[in-house]
């Protein structure tokens, strides 16, 4: 027996050992997420679509924020209005121009005694915050705490897939914003020529401390995330001269903000800016850093099954087996479903675009009408419209990562007026889209302007269509 071991060891070169270790590492990276979990029976039994509708005016009002300039303006205004506490959750936070605007506003709020808590996903948190003088300057302010959700570590490959994808801003437990925008100039303001267009909601509580109100639900959700052992403190251990210079720069930037965005620093009439709602509810995925039960997808599908017509916005479509089955069930129940997603030529996510090229016939086969939007900018919107009352807006992409791996949030808003506003935008976007007709030929909206892909991009997607096949459930 000893002789056999010796022969095996003799044939194990350094290269072979490294290859074995690499295979083991890749296995640890993907194996925990290979099998999709099921929705627990208790959750299925307790879920009632009718519970998301109200019988009359509720305690919360809503505003719809559909452009990047307004998105920055709202954030600056709300942060300025805070008197007790600010909570910010974001998937990506960059110290670019828009990011520094938000950091400067948060720092000034802390200077006037407001408690500030920020949580950032651990992938972008490690890459963007580590050693960054602007974030170090912010966290060194009294009353400011920053945590990183599940920081990426090469020594824990089984955790790398689980990401925090939530984006919301809570002010004094009385109002908040929630949607799909990250904290960077790609989504906020007019700093960059490249933009992603997104939608989000502002919610304002008219009756203080209604524990059933959505703001209470969002706050409880945040506290659960914040208390997780995997939410690690981000600290400034030593305030260097570089950090002190960044602090000075940010304080000066606050003066620039007040001069440049004067409207943000005036009194706003929230009642005039918002719409009456019957009910607002929070839908979420599990928060643990592991393979997740698809609670949010199940909730959306159950709500869609009760509708006659469904319009969905998603930046890209990456369906797993269970998601295909869910779409087929909608078709078999007579629910008319349409999706608005990016045309491959305008999409910002190469993984999603590539998978759509591979899977589009199968998606069309479920009976879903897919509108391929050719907008001026790439769409990052995640929304679902059910008939003429219910609108769902948030961070959930129609893909397997949002379904099984990431934390995700969607607000379910029973508000006919909001539904009407978003539907009008959807009709405009459909006019700038193309759709596959029953005759197998594309039909083009009047506003669709073709955009030819470069030869390099075509070659890139040709290669990617092969490479993504074994990886698609992790895209």
Please identify what each model-predicted range represents:
Residues 147-149:
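Lumenal/extracellular "mature" regions of secretory-pathway glycan-modifying transferases
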Residues 2-144, 154-162, 171-475:
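Charged, low-complexity intrinsically disordered terminal segments
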